[in-house]
Amino acid sequence: MSVAVIIDLPNGNEQRYEQVIATVFPEDKLPEGWLVHIAGPIEGGWRVVNVVPSQEEFETFANDRLRPAFEQAGEPDIVPQFTFFPVYKLIQTGTERS
């Protein structure tokens, strides 16, 4: 079953997000099996929501790619907070929205 991952980034912003995302998703290409990546501002930071094949797969991605990307971007004050939940239903139109 797919899993949704909510990532809250206190003190995050669009510029910091773009720095990190350029490293982890070259050419805006999601890893195989990922269904959704959504990002935007929230009060006090930035929020990212992903729908991924499993929590374990995401945790491997976070350890191997995401954390090193934060370090490379020089963002030690941003500590991601992860929340996971199983996806019961996902409805998509198949079009990009922003």
Walk through the language-model features, giving the residues of each.
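Short S/T/G/P-rich N-terminal loop/turn motif that feeds into the first structured element of a domain
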Residues: 1-49, 53-68, 75-98
